[in-house]
């Protein structure tokens, strides 16, 4: 029986500033929810660094957060948490 395959080496040097774009409906509480999740994974997260970009029609909002990534596991869990939030449509 072959041993389990090892994870490939990371292309990211940790710790590093890591931008994540989160898109969802332009609704009350969306930005606050994204910021709250970011703070759970990066307690030093600066909400002042959040970038907002509304869609052309204004129905959707792109929120770019930059977190301090400390590990692949942290980023994976952050992406999972954001992706499963009911207000979030897409995480890039």
Q: What is each of the regions a protein language model found here?
A:
Residues 1-92:
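Long, contiguous binding/interaction regions
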């Amino acid at each position: 029986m072959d041993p389990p395959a090892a994870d490939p080496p990371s292309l990211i040097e940790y710790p590093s500033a890591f931008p994540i774009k989160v898109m969802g409906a332009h609704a009350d509480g969306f930005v606050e929810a994204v910021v709250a999740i970011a703070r759970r994974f990066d307690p030093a997260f600066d909400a002042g660094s959040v970038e907002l970009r509304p869609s052309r029609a204004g129905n959707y909002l792109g929120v770019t957060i930059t977190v301090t990534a400390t590990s692949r596991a942290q980023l994976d869990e952050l992406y999972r948490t954001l992706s499963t939030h009911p207000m979030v449509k897409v995480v890039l």
